[in-house]
A protein has these predicted regions:
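Bacterial Sec-dependent N-terminal signal peptides
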Residues: 1-15
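Buried hydrophobic residues that stabilize the cores of well-folded domains
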Residues: 12-277
Length: 277
């Protein structure tokens, strides 16, 4: 499921807020994001029409065209995705127990339930169809500090894949190993983090330990990515560089983001944020 709440690899009962996960400063009440095409005019460019949907045939909206709503504690209550014409594409709703733990999400007609161990760490989530049929579920093996050591993905109660995590002393996931249902290694990802716990480099290896891809990131002082370089080694060498320029509001949240691919402007995303007083 695309929009299940992001798996938290740190202590669940001290999970970061969705403000933090979204890189937002201040008490954000709502965030409305709209992507726009870029129109070049000689050596300059301007904002064009709202960017196209991902697929107009099977009707899949642009996932950058969305609104996030937060409760006063910084946790998501709703995410809505829109088509180019502003019609609703899909909706994700979040529900919390009195302790503040996420216990249920609803994506369109599907329902996902979340299970915690006595220490308050997430150990399972399961998604059901409207008729109550179990579609997928995830099992999380955690250590005494709540860090996810192993994540198992099941489809209709059949194991599909497993991810094993290794952490550094700072608690960052520095290695992820991906396995199929039979336990065969599919790929391995090594990650390097900065002092702000933001990923600076990912190196992806295939099952034969051959380097497939290197992705590097650079950030500005606000913690927003300003450069992403993806260098493919296999099956053929290829390198692409994305750079980003931002405009910020008084809270330090970006309200406009321009994306360049290999130096060419590709997209402008504008965000409107409202805040709790």
């Amino acid at each position: 499921i695309l929009f299940i709440a992001t798996t938290i690899l740190t202590a669940q009962h001290k999970a970061p807020t969705d403000w933090e996960l979204s890189g937002l400063k201040g008490k954000v009440k709502s965030q409305r994001s709209i992507p726009y095409e870029v129109v070049t005019q000689g050596k300059t460019f301007v904002k064009g029409a709202i960017d196209r949907d991902l697929d107009t045939v099977v009707k899949i909206g642009n996932l950058d065209n969305l609104q996030k709503d937060f409760n006063p504690n910084g946790y998501l209550t709703q995410m809505r995705f829109f088509f180019k014409n502003d019609e609703l594409y899909s909706r994700m709703e979040y529900y919390y127990n009195p302790q503040g733990q996420l216990f249920e999400t609803r994506y369109n007609s599907d329902k996902t339930l979340y299970v915690y161990n006595p220490e308050g760490y997430l150990i399972k989530d399961a998604t059901y169809s409207p008729g109550g049929f179990l579609k997928t579920h995830y099992n999380y093996q955690v250590d005494t500090n709540g860090k996810v050591l192993k994540e198992e993905t099941y489809h209709a109660n059949q194991l599909e894949s497993t991810i094993a995590y290794t952490y550094n002393k700072q608690g960052d996931p520095v290695e992820m190993r991906y396995y199929d249902a039979q336990g065969n290694l599919l790929q391995r990802v090594e990650s390097k983090f900065n002092k702000q716990h933001l990923a600076e480099r990912n190196r992806t290896y295939d099952k034969d330990n051959k380097l497939v891809n290197i992705t590097t990131k650079k950030y500005n002082s606000q913690g927003d990515c300003i450069k992403l370089q993806a260098e493919n080694k296999l099956p053929q060498k290829q390198k692409n560089v994305a750079t980003y320029e931002y405009k910020y509001d008084n809270q330090g949240n970006w309200i406009a983001k321009t994306t360049f691919i290999n130096g060419e402007p590709r997209q402008i995303i504008e965000r409107t944020l409202s805040y709790y007083e």
